[in-house]
Amino acid sequence: MGKATLQVFLTTAAREDLDEIAIYWMERGEPERGEKYAEDLHRTATTELSDEDTALHGKTFAGDGATAIRELRVFKRAYRIFYLMDEQSGRVAVLRFWHSRRDEPEL
């Protein structure tokens, strides 16, 4: 594990993304798959991004320095977790969960 444990929280948009993922699969007749993806994405975000070293090494998506929006690619790079890290407060805000095949999100 890394240097410090960070507090990770999901924004409203990130929570809505998880709901949309579950709905997407439910509409395709695979509700269990959607629930599993949503649960696994949430767990991965809170586990991985609570580690300061992991959070610091996310690829910069937009901005720079303390205001940089970073991304963590997960599940064989199929999903992207966009987040902001505030080193001073020790908090990470998960902004969006995004499938890699979709157009770039507006953040």
Predicted features along the sequence, with ranges:
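Enriched for short, Lys/Arg-rich terminal
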Residues: 1, 72-107
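Basic, Lys/Arg-enriched alpha-helical interface segments
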Residues: 1-69, 88, 105-107
